[in-house]
Design a protein with these regions (language model features):
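Boundary/entry segment of secreted carbohydrate-active catalytic domains
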Residues: 22-53, 298
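Alpha-helical scaffolding within the catalytic cores
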Residues: 41-49, 78-83, 124-129, 191-210, ...
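Active-site groove signature of glycoside hydrolases
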Residues: 65, 125-160, 296
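Aromatic-lined carbohydrate-recognition surfaces of secreted/lumenal glycan-active proteins
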Residues: 96-102, 165-203, 249-258
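An active-site-proximal structural segment forming one wall of the substrate-binding cleft
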Residues: 112-141, 207-211
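Aromatic- and acid-rich polysaccharide-binding/catalytic face
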Residues: 139, 145-149, 203-232
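Glycoside hydrolase catalytic-domain groove-lining segments
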Residues: 170, 181, 185, 220-263
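Substrate-binding cleft of secreted/luminal carbohydrate-active enzymes
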Residues: 223-226, 247-314
Length: 314
């Protein structure tokens, strides 16, 4: 055997090992409005999605659960969610309700006059779960409400808007407690919030720590395409993981697969073996950390394109 062939075989073995390590961590995927509604409308679309995701060892879907294009299936046709969640559960998969929408401009929900909309959005999920059969209930909630998307986000307004996010989150968590339900609720959170110290309810600490205190878990938008070194997945998650370890909370590492600038934000353009190697390094670093909740991929359509299994055209 030539050295080149031997080296190639060794590389393949190492990548396979990295992939097998990464497979041990839970994997989830964000499924946004159009793809979620397509799965809810057509069971065959959902079944095809389950097949692909299970082949890629993805065990949890963050399924959109609010209004889209004039419909709100959670309220108007809850049986569609019943059927979807039952089918996922029958395959051993979990389903979290995904809340927040670019179409609905939900970044505005951090504003005091609109925070009640965020609570109402969650309350609809809680009401659905209370009425649904056990096998058709959501397993958790993830909300993606990003105040930095507001036009008014700037240095002078940032503290006020972040306090609004915390007030909104506190109100949402109170609604969950009042419901008597125990499903975990947590936000998508940028990794850079750990660099912003904020006074809130008598305590000054990084915004990330306030959020971890408030919620059951965080999905950390840790959008980098290498595991180690400066400006990496591990470096940007370090403070959140350390704090969550101390507080008994969970951090799910969010990774990006869609095109973006700069290129370091996403695995787009890399091959799947390279991604698995980086994911394996993250899990190797965190496998003994109680805070590590696995990975969540952004997003369903982008991830499917990345692995060479694009969403079929309608």
């Amino acid at each position: 055997m030539s050295l080149r062939r031997a080296g190639g075989g060794l590389l393949a073995a190492l990548l396979a090992l990295a992939g097998s390590v990464a497979a041990q961590a839970p994997r989830a995927v964000w499924v946004w409005e159009a793809d979620s509604y397509a799965m809810l409308d057509v069971p065959a679309v959902a079944e095809e999605a389950f097949d692909v995701l299970q082949r890629k060892r993805i065990g949890t879907l963050y399924l959109y659960a609010d209004a889209y294009q004039g419909r709100n299936l959670l309220v108007q046709q809850p049986a569609r969610y019943h059927a979807f969640i039952r089918a996922a559960h029958a395959r051993g998969m979990q389903v979290y309700a995904l809340l927040g929408s670019w179409h609905l401009h939900t970044e505005r929900y951090v504003l005091p006059r609109q925070q009640k909309k965020a609570v109402a959005m969650l309350q609809r999920v809680l009401d659905y779960n209370a009425a649904a059969p056990a096998e058709a209930r959501f397993d958790g909630v993830n909300y993606d409400i990003e105040p930095h998307l507001l036009d008014e986000w700037e240095d002078a307004t940032r503290p006020r808007l972040l306090r609004g996010f915390l007030d909104m989150s506190a109100a949402m968590m109170q609604a969950r407690r009042a419901s008597g339900q125990t499903l975990p609720v947590g936000p998508a959170m940028p990794f850079w919030w750990d660099g912003i110290a904020l006074e809130w309810r008598g305590a000054r600490k990084p915004v990330s720590e306030h959020v971890i205190d408030l919620t059951d878990y965080v999905a950390l938008m840790d959008y980098r395409n290498r595991a180690e070194g400066r400006d990496s997945i591990l470096s940007h998650a370090a403070s959140e993981m350390a704090y969550a370890d101390r507080e008994g909370k969970r951090v799910v590492i969010g990774l990006e697969f869609n095109p973006g600038e700069p290129a370091k934000l996403s695995f787009h353009g890399m091959d799947e073996a390279a991604f698995e190697a980086e994911a394996g390094r993250v899990e190797a670093a965190y496998r003994k950390r109680t805070a590590f909740g696995g990975f969540v991929f952004h997003h369903y359509a982008g991830y499917r394109r990345f692995v060479g299994a694009p969403v079929p055209a309608e």
